[in-house]
Amino acid sequence: MAGPRRGPGRIPEKPKNFKGTITKLFRCLGRYRLPLVLVLVLALASTAFGIVGPKILSTATTELATGLGRKLSGLGGIDFGKIGKILLTVLALYLVSAVCSFFQSWILAGITQKLAYRLRGEISAKIHRMPMRYFERNTVGDVLSRITNDVDTMSSGMAQSVTQLVTNVTMLVGVLVMMLRISWLMTLIALIVLPVTGVLTGRIVKRSQRYFVAQQKNLGDINGKVEETYAGHNVVCAFNREGATQKEFDAINARLYRSAWKSQFLSGLMSPVTTFVSKLGYVCVVELGGSLAARGTITIGDIQAFLNYMANFTQPITQLAQISTQLQTMAAAAERVFAFLDEAEEPADPALPAPAEHIRGDVSFRHVRFGYDPAQPVIHDWSCDVPAGRTVAIVGPTGAGKTTMVKLLMRFYDVDAGAIFVDGRDVRDYARGDLRRAFGMVLQDTWLFKGTIMENIRYGRPEATDAEVIAAAKAARADAFIRTLPGGYQMELNEEATNVSQGQKQLLTIARAVLANAPILILDEATSSVDTRTEQLIQEAMDHLMRGRTSFVIAHRLSTIRNADCILVMRDGNIVEQGTHSELLARGGFYAALYNSQFEDVVA
């Protein structure tokens, strides 16, 4: 992915509602009202002291010139005492200005970092209250970007733009007032330089922008080509495409070179052009100032002060343009943060939740209807009773609604109609955390985090002892392979857990479910990622584990669920058949067709 653009072609991200976002941001800053007021006062003071400095310093220049004149005419000399006092006054002003600027920056840094700290905490807490629907609708990268990039962009944008906006506006107005006080005619000449510079800069920006856009496109293309070639290096080599791939890369690289050269060349023209125009303005001002000084309208020191102000006049204008970009970027980031914080949350738990400490495992589905989009239900009218301790297998083609039923049972989603009961109580009567503690679960997608194998298994029950963790690993047939790894149970898994095989990941997640020792067990494709021998070992362990527990087994490979007490066959969101393995085969219905088709595939 291409990086951010620099130079005149940079196009900042803009918020959809700038005013509304800034209003929310100020509301967030309400608790820091007094420190913010102090920051603004210090910023104004620092700028004001900096503005009056050149005017006071000009009196020293005037005194020096006057003293030289007196000395040459024999009427006196230079009053160094007076000049020294003036210089000390200016030094004191600049020192106070620097102190004000230091404390203003220190206080503002504290405010912005406290705000960032608070927002990260609020986003993290919000994530745990968000419905599963949100995470299935949005990418993981987008959610992570809110808590890292957007919060950082927002806080750094505030630190850079808030005081700069105040100081630069104050500087612009203050410098203009001081220039007018010295000479309105010289000020007029100085102001004429601005539109000339603006016109020339605008023409350069307009011409260079298309090259910056082309540069970014070509940069994205070259990054994509490198990533594609790197990811598919084996395929490139296998088909002897190294030469062709290099030619394609060279063509993109050449386009990037041409567009980058033109954009950087035109961008580089801005500085010499604006410098030339501003220097031309200096020449005109000095010429006019010398004429006015000769007539006694102004002093030599006034000319020196005016040139100083003239140099400072264009700086805040340039910085205000940059601040505008920073504010847009900051507001866009803040808008994304606030949009996330304003997202609808899961319905609150009941005020008096049902006790869940001694759940037996009786589960009932009563006319359940559900759809990820309510207008398109995937579960139509599902009813089923599962007594405690029974093993129920749920089978059916992809999209039949098998995994959806598990999500509803654990309240990752709530039903659109009907109800699900656990031990005779509607699952919505339990607090979500209490309900989910009653489930041990092994999902299709194995999830392990960075840490030791011991820590990953213990995630199922944080208070478990090492001996209990090892016992769970043995029950899941994971102990043998763990002991062959470097470090054994203390081996560190990396962030993606790529230093163990997919089958080993599956065994570790099963060990975690064993350790949880919950009354209800959910196995979603639990043996889909292991070899036949490992699957047999796991199946034996699961048969032992499921005794005395209500177990829901979801599997496409029907050979793994022959021993289930009941098999529910789902099709298009409905239960079309139910019974034991032998009963369903004897009926010769949809289940028998599924089973026979898999058997034929194995034989073939």
Task: Please report, for each region that a protein language model flagged, where it lies by residue.
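Transmembrane helix-loop-helix hairpins at lipid-water interfaces of multipass membrane proteins
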Residues: L36-C100, L180-L185, V283, A294-I300
